[in-house]
Amino acid sequence: MFDIHREELDWGGRTLVLETGKMARQADGAVFASYGDTTVLATVVSAREPKPGQDFFPLTVNYQEKTYAAGRIPGGYFKREGRPSEKETLVSRLIDRPIRPLFADGYKNDTQVVVTVLAHDLENDPDVLSMVAASAALTLSGVPFMGPIGGARVGFVGDEYVLNPTIEELKDSALDLVVAGTSDAVLMVESEAKELSEEVMLGAVMFGHRHFQPVIEAIIRLAEKAAKEPRPFEPVDHSALEAKIREIAEADLRAAYKIKQKQARYEAVGAAKSKVKKYFEQLAIDGQEAPKAQDVAEVLKGLEAKIVRWAILDDGIRIDGRDVKTVRPIVSEVGILPRAHGSALFTRGETQALVVATLGTGEDEQFIDSLEGTYKEHFLLHYNFPPFSVGETGRMGSPGRREIGHGKLAWRAIHPMLPAKHEFPYTLRVVSEILESNGSSSMATVCGTSLSLMDAGVPLKSPVAGIAMGLILEGEKFAVLSDILGDEDHLGDMDFKVAGTESGVTALQMDIKIAGITEEIMKVALAQAKDGRAHILGEMSKALTSARAELGEHAPRIEVMKIAVDKIREVIGSGGKVIREIVEKTGAKINIEDDGTIKIASASGDSIKAAINWIKSIASEPEVGAIYDGTVVKVVDFGAFVNFFGSKDGLVHISQLSKERVAKSSDVVKEGDKVKVKLVGFDERGKTRLSMKAVDQTTGEDLEAKAKSEKDAAKEGDEAGAAE
């Protein structure tokens, strides 16, 4: 019944299995893959014909995690998987990016890749396995895919690279890098690093490339046994159409691409395209054969690319007049918004990001439910890209895949530089509002995030900057571009984003639109990016060089204290009664952890102090000889009862009210008076004895200790005089 084909190999100390012929047989390609006990199913279906009028390649990649894969039931009311999580969106992009450039030019058939996680051993992350399985399914499917590709994760522990580190091993790694590519070249890199050098990063990329070659060979062996017949596909020859369009509009397009200002350039390019469109419309009106509008648009795009690319390769001059290494003018400003905890406006050429940092408490942490379990995230970074940023109208609403991906890249760049949570116990939310975009808005977000966090008083280990690099490659000739424009991104061959500090790289993302690039090109790009990053950090330092000494005026203050674990129940109280009363009366937010750590937060220092004193009064005992603030709660003939140390009450005997003789207690104090008392001890019945006369009521100084100190000093003086 089943025609099963299977390939196995030992890869990084674990067995990788690729199998086809048993599951999802009606898909064009289907591969059941496992690594350790993590298992995925990848399927590919591609339409037989493109939709009429289709002018782009409609590739969709859906990565989905099923909670049964980890033996869990989904949370929530409906108890089934819902909209894609951030992780699912990011892995979908991770798979999409290296496979997209390998489809044949001109192929426009609707194509869907679906990868489903069926089992997760909680050791091996399914993302790389999913990429490998998708590559294998595409290779078997018969669609015009110029693969296969391989992929690998690389860690860096103790100055050594680690192939496919487990989830636990990654916790000790200074690097989390995923690389994908063909047997000849690298196509995609995604990474987070702890200030590693460019040499280490490049070494990691090439280490991963070498070690996924056996995977590519296994996919080829599987394809030799089980691949479907290649689909017939012949790209349309547009050479005659291109010659005509060159005749009509090449001169106008060349002139347009010498205009440095984006909007003016777009208007000139639009005018040239309109001229072409009108020419072919007139042909149709005259009854002559006219090409399809989508073919005209495709040829025009190719002509634009050639004009821009050869101007750079031949003359070293870019669209806006810069040479290949120059970064656009930068303006950095902080403290832009009056009520925000931290804010920055970062402008680089025609790209601008308004970035706002907000500090919160443990209650504000994001609860994340993943296959690995549930946890809380205290650093959130949200990237918004409204249509007005590029002078267009468009959809507004929940973030798309691109916004989620760009936000996560900026998150990776900043995350290694955050202070340890126990040193800075705040929840951090950063929002980047892209106000203008002409290339590299994600790297503007990195720069703005660094500035806004420092403006909020967050003690980053070092400022972080990011830069986007581009590539123009024709045969053996290439040019690496620093700080690319949007047009250079669209018309170029690479989008290579590098973020880091003066000391090293913290994040690296690379997407290639051609069949891959070599180690030499990556080496040039990394070196050029390092110079650009240093320049940007210098420009940022004109606004702020390090975190402000104090938190923002409107930010909450957090104090941390610790109590014995067996006292937690008393602080919380029956049904939370006690903790609710403390919060209500003091106005502070209180978070109690299982180990007895308590975080008290409020914008008011008095509120925090009151909450701390209240908790101390429950969880600990007052110390004999210590001085406390108190309130007179009752005046009696023989003294006054004073509330102190939270909810503790003690008696100040009439003889302890004042140094002077007191006839009536009410002559010295009355109910509600704020006083300072010293705990002098306990009577035989365990009742607390307090003294007011032992304390200076203005300064809180211990008068008994002061008198003793003066007496001891005088005695030492007498003894010294006698000795003489």
Swiss-Prot record:
Its main location: cytoplasm. Residues 556-615 form the KH domain. The keyword Electron transport does not apply. Mg(2+) binds at D489, D495. Keywords: Cytoplasm, Magnesium, Metal-binding, Nucleotidyltransferase, RNA-binding, Transferase. Involved in mRNA degradation. Catalyzes the phosphorolysis of single-stranded polyribonucleotides processively in the 3'- to 5'-direction. This is Polyribonucleotide nucleotidyltransferase. It comes from Azorhizobium caulinodans (strain ATCC 43989 / DSM 5975 / JCM 20966 / LMG 6465 / NBRC 14845 / NCIMB 13405 / ORS 571).
